Amino acid sequence: MRAEVGKASGRTGTANGNLALATAAFALTFWAWNLVAPLSRTYTEHLDLSPARTSLLVAVPVLVGSLGRIPVGALTDRYGGRVMFTAVGLVSIVPTFLVGVSGDSYGMLLLWGFFLGIAGTSFAVGIPFVSAWFEPGRRGFATGVFGAGMGGTALSAFLTPLLVERLGLFTTHLLMCAALAAVSALMWAFSRDAPDWRPRTGAALPRMREAVRLKATWQASLLYAVAFGGFVAFSTYLPTLLTTAYDFAQTDAGMRTAGFAIAAVAARPVGGVLSDRIGPVRVCLASFLGTCVFAIVLALHPPAEFPAGLSFVLIAISLGLGTGGVFALVAKLVEPSRVGTVTGLVGAAGGLGGYFPPLLMGAVYQATGEYTLGFVLLAAVSVAVALYTSRAFRQT
């Protein structure tokens, strides 16, 4: 009996250590993924960009980071999280450096921003990696804590403009390259795949077909496109929105975007824990209904600090709860050997959900001079997905 307790305790310690490493790696790669958006005003003024071109610039890394999760998730099922975290971190160094030397060319920023999206694929590595370390009843907690690595976007929103202001664009990107190299080395040296994890052999395409045939994949993809897509869209476009709609300075907009991201990040593990206790469906319903309510408030273009500032924080909390709830649902509905591939597909849907809103918001603002229509559409989509969730998961 004592031996069994000791073994369980040791595994828990190892699980927590790997969870901490994975969360740190996720945060740093997400910071790299979000290097362009906090500097949108700088690029806009320096290169004389229209709102539509600025929106495209901040959205391109999101697109690649989203679609790239599909093959990366499948590769994680085959090679494991230790190998894939190390690989994603090291490969991301190249575009991080090249974006840092391309500030004078819109075309080169688009090109290297495209490849910077690779950093955003780390999400599809981490979910199966940490899920394998925990028993089913604790996977909501594990994926929620790992999801707190989304705080990398908060770090980027707050620190990137300050670092560029004090050190310059090139030095800031060079520091990020060093950080990516360091976290990749740490993952390779100290992380381990779970003892129960086994690589899935065979071609990746058949495994993707299997995942696509699962009803749970499509259901979770829809929910995540709204929850995580909303978070990504706000994280990438909020600096632009605050500087155009409320005339904040770039550093002030960055601080407020960081506050938004911190609220969402803090809410994600809460969503995971609540999912373990009251069920992921209820958590997702609360998320989507809350998003709808606060989007309506923002559509009225209220004063900047109150109620707009409070509404941005509350919508961040709502979206954060939803991101934790969706992957608790995935862990509940999908067998562990398929979680990596399914995570890649669901993560891609979430990222794509964050790709189109910045483009839409830029077009709406260019046409009307305000963002009302964009917030109305967010409210409508949120309530529609809430209705779908209540009907599709009645027995879950």
Where in the sequence are the language-model features?
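A late C-terminal transmembrane helix in Major Facilitator Superfamily
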Residues: 333-370
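Conserved MFS/SLC helix-loop-helix module at the cytosolic interface between two early adjacent transmembrane helices
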Residues: 67-104, 275
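Cytoplasmic helix-loop-helix junction between adjacent transmembrane helices
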Residues: 112-149
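Residue-level signature of mid-helix packing/kink "hotspots" within the transmembrane helices
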Residues: 34, 62-70, 121, 153-155, ...
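Flexible cytoplasmic inter-helical loops of multi-pass small-molecule transporters
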Residues: 189-210
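C-terminal transmembrane helical hairpin of 12-TM major facilitator-type secondary transporters
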Residues: 279-329
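Helix-loop-helix hairpin linking two adjacent transmembrane segments in secondary transporters
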Residues: 145-191
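Extracytoplasmic gate region of multi-pass secondary transporters
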Residues: 36-38, 216-269
